[in-house]
Amino acid sequence: MHTVFLGDYIKTRRLELGLTQEELCEGICEPITISRLENGRQTPSRNNINALLQRLGLPGDRYFALLSKQEQQIELLKKEIISCNVRHQSAAAPERSAILKETYEKIAALEALADGDDHLLRQFLLRTKVHLGREDGEPYSLDEKLEMLLAAIRLTVPKFDLEEIDQHLYCMDEIKVINQIANLYMEMGQNRKATAIFRQLLKYIQKHYQNIQESAGHLPLVASNYALALYKCRYYEEALEIAEQGRQSCVKFGYYGSLPNLLHTMAQCRFQLGDEEGSKALFYQAYYLYRATDGPRGAALLQEDARECWGISFAY
């Protein structure tokens, strides 16, 4: 096995991209930390190392590190919070309050472990709260959500500008925040604004994440949301093109979480373009993928769309 010193690995890639230490570490750690890393005198936390590698477009699966007890607790709590968040979104009303309480208890435990200068962790907590809403169960307003998400991305990218997304480097968690921002604009009815953000975001992923297996789900996710925004703007052919890119990425990397959404949007676009055979086939494919992946909400929405477009009624 060929072994490469981590500091050299990062420095070589940084210089290939023409980046200064300050540009690479902005919002994650201090330049002196990068200098010490490259010289072998210090190793940052695994969370920070992963973020730096992702910003450089490098895979993190070749890097291994021992975790401190605190880092182990933080990683475990993050996974539990993500799991609770997913359960909360799909739970029936009677269960949601109990899950919400459980999640905020875990958030409080995580906040107690967090260092004040751990911007990545604070960012994670902010975007999680946007999904969850307040502790009393009341959702944040759309304007409040936007304010929270912009604050979250600017924790690690202080000069972030929605008009010039490609002027900075991003780790995968930062990509998720920007994706949330674009989705929020779509929810506000500002679909053209959303498409402008998704267009930049997809281009960034295609350029920087070619070598990162861990990012396999990001391109289909962004392509799915981008295609939906284009559909809402009535750019049906462009929406089909973007959705097809997402579909191909799902097949290539074996990541199918966004596939039913992509096929759903493609079915609607085909309907608008008068392609009855193609549209019906895609509706059926999307419906049974929703069923297979336990997506009841998506399946219900698709049933309505299929019935409205073609009078299709799914028996199973």
Give residue ranges: language-model regions.
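DNA major-groove recognition helix of helix-turn-helix/homeodomain DNA-binding modules
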Residues: 47-63
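Structural motif corresponding to the intra-repeat A-B loop/turn of tetratricopeptide repeats
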Residues: 17, 136-139, 188, 233, ...
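Short alpha-helical DNA-recognition segment
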Residues: 15-36
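A short, Lys/Arg-rich alpha-helix, primarily the initiator
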Residues: 1-16
